[in-house]
């Protein structure tokens, strides 16, 4: 939703106003941040605004959008604003993939937070550690869940990007797997520094092999720069593994507190990103508060 973006922009000193049809705790929090929130949509609400941002749930004939058009005020969809926010930070970490985005974004945010880097975050699920769907930190990092629906992730400017997997999803929009893979290719090409990719996912690697970009891989079965070895189910449905890194013979034992073997891949992506940005191996142990997807 809009709330994490409001948190971030308010913290950076932007003057914000908005409207909603329902009152609640979120609106109370927004007002406490200094945001002027009106209940109900009204043409007068947009007077004086430099830009109007709307969510995908807002119809094109909304009275405020019509008023903005008549006043010559630019209007942009939320994903465009998210792209702008991604460029406000020195290091934007954008997590993409058909499955596992929320979990991995939460894991990376958790590790950075507990390492004292005070990241900002925009997450598709609620993260208990920060008691919300995002946060406005004071550090140089922002962690963003990058959704492929309707190509919204192509509005982002990742410094580092993650591609967890590419599976049959949103084909009603893309029309074919080929077009979906092409969208992920465009996302990867927008990455400014490093891409982290799942070497066990064929569709992901099909895309990576076409790129002239820096790529680090993570894997269980295939060769990867970051691998999970000595996997053990320490209690029903919960796994632990040794993290083997490309540049050292040392390993780190990682125990997951979120269930499911698939979360090994999400944890590997977290480990790869966090080690790359300079976190110690000990910091990778803190995944217990990550939200599951």
What are these regions (language model features)?
Residues 32-47:
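Glycine-rich, highly charged phosphate/nucleotide-binding loops
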Residues 1-6:
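Glycine-rich adenosine-cofactor-binding loop
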Residues 286-293:
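Conserved small/polar residues in nucleotide/adenosyl-binding loops
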Residues 17-27:
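NAD(P)-binding Rossmann-fold cofactor-contacting core
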Residues 258-269:
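Short glycine/threonine-rich catalytic loop with a Thr-x-Gly-x-Asp
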Residues 16-19, 121, 217:
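Short beta-strand "acidic-cap" motif of Rossmann-like dinucleotide-binding folds
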Residues 8-11, 28-31, 45, 56, ...:
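Phosphate-binding loop of NTP-binding sites
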């Amino acid at each position: 939703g809009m709330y994490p973006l409001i948190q971030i922009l308010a913290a950076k000193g932007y003057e914000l106003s908005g409207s909603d049809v329902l009152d609640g705790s979120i609106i109370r929090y927004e007002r406490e941040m200094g945001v002027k929130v009106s209940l109900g949509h009204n043409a007068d609400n947009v007077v004086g605004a430099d830009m109007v941002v709307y969510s995908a749930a807002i119809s094109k004939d909304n009275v405020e959008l019509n008023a903005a058009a008549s006043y010559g005020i630019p209007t942009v969809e939320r994903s465009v604003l998210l792209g702008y926010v991604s460029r406000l930070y020195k290091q934007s970490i954008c997590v993409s993939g058909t499955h596992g985005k929320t979990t991995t974004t939460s894991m990376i945010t958790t590790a950075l937070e507990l390492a004292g880097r005070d990241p900002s975050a925009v997450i598709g699920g609620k993260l208990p550690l920060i008691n919300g769907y995002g946060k406005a930190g004071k550090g140089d990092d922002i962690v963003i869940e990058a959704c492929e629906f309707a190509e919204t992730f192509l509005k982002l400017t990742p410094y580092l990007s993650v591609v967890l997997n590419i599976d049959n999803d949103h084909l009603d929009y893309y029309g074919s797997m080929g077009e979906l893979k092409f969208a992920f290719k465009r996302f990867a090409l927008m990455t400014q520094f490093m891409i982290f990719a799942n070497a066990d996912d064929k569709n992901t690697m099909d895309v990576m092999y076409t790129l002239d970009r820096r790529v680090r891989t993570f894997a269980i079965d295939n060769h990867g720069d970051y691998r999970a070895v000595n996997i053990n189910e320490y209690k029903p449905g919960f796994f632990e593994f040794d993290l083997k890194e490309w540049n050292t013979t040392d390993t780190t034992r990682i125990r997951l507190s979120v269930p499911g073997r698939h979360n090994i891949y999400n944890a590997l992506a977290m480990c790869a990103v966090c080690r790359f940005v300079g976190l110690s191996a000990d910091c990778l142990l803190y995944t217990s508060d990550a939200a599951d997807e």
